[in-house]
Amino acid sequence: MTQTPPARRMRLGIAPALEEGGMKGKTPRFKDIQAMAQAAERAGFDSLWLEDHLLFRFPNQPEQGCWEGFTFLSAVAAVTTRIALGSFVAATSFRNPALLAKMAESLDEISDGRFILGLGAGWHEPEYTAFGYLFDHRAARFEEALQIIVPLLREGQVDFAGQYYSARECVLRPRGPSQGQLPIWIGASKPRMLRLVERYADAWNTVWHRQPQGVRDVMPEFLAACQEVGRDPASIELTAGSFAEIVLPGEQRKPDAKGIGGQAEEVAAGLRGFADVGVRHLVLLVEPEDITGIERFARVIELLDEMEASAGQQPG
């Protein structure tokens, strides 16, 4: 039976790769993602996240195709029972906003209320060009998309006509178990996007940081945006993405390793630093990149829970 993890100051998520070569140089198949999701449940992870990319094409590098994330999330929802599932993050420009809200509501139903909708404006222009999407005015398009997606998910209806998108007398029916409370994360770093976080999001995804200090460094802009919009920063959950590599005694870290790494005790101590700077949900790219990394990480989760329990017992 899957064990429900204890209440945590900072929840932990894992983000398996969907791109070619993303699993120790191999292309992940659905059976691999399914096995990793089920292993993550057993290990005590709180959430599992899948990316929303179509194609990676960088200069002087082999191009990498990606599986479609929402299709995989639907399948993962059917073979898991406890772990939360999310998009990290869905590019609103890849889909009609009203349809994206419908997809999120459907995933809410399939997962029995475990889905989290992570949203972003997209960034990798080559995949836009390859698949025929417009790359211009991404922030403006994103803002209009939110004006459709958020009312649909919250109130179940919207009537909107903008420069880029419209949804006239649109209703979202039937409704899933979250009943208008499906969590919405927004990934953002620039001032204009941060203002959209304050207006529409339940959680701010501060994107990727190798160390906790990276989160601390971006907080002033976040607080300024909150003040400008008039929202209490405490009402927005702080989330981040990072990297963790777990090695066994006698093993060495990869030469190009980034983020926090070492044996389980070192990784646990390093990750705890994210909780100390206010992160309440940390999404990780874990090395090794297959089920081995998840199984090794189970010990890290045990250590983090022990640290939290010990801290809670200390006087004062």
Language-model features: locations:
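A structural motif
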Residues: 42-45, 112, 201, 279
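Non-catalytic positions within long, well-ordered alpha-helices that form the structural scaffold/packing
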Residues: 41, 108, 272-276
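Active-site beta-loop-alpha junctions enriched in small/polar residues
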Residues: 17-19, 53, 90-92, 120-122, ...
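Internal, glycine-rich beta/alpha segment that forms the wall or movable "lid"
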Residues: 2-10, 56, 60-62, 87, ...
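Active-site mouth loops of central-metabolism enzymes
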Residues: 16-31, 90-98, 179-189, 252-265
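N-terminal beta1-alpha1-beta2 module of alpha/beta enzyme domains
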Residues: 1-79, 182, 285-290, 294, ...
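Hydrophobic faces of well-ordered beta-strands that scaffold small-molecule active sites
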Residues: 12-16, 48-50, 84-87, 115-119, ...
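C-terminal helical cap(s) of enzyme catalytic domains, especially alpha/beta-barrels
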Residues: 145-150, 213-223, 290-311
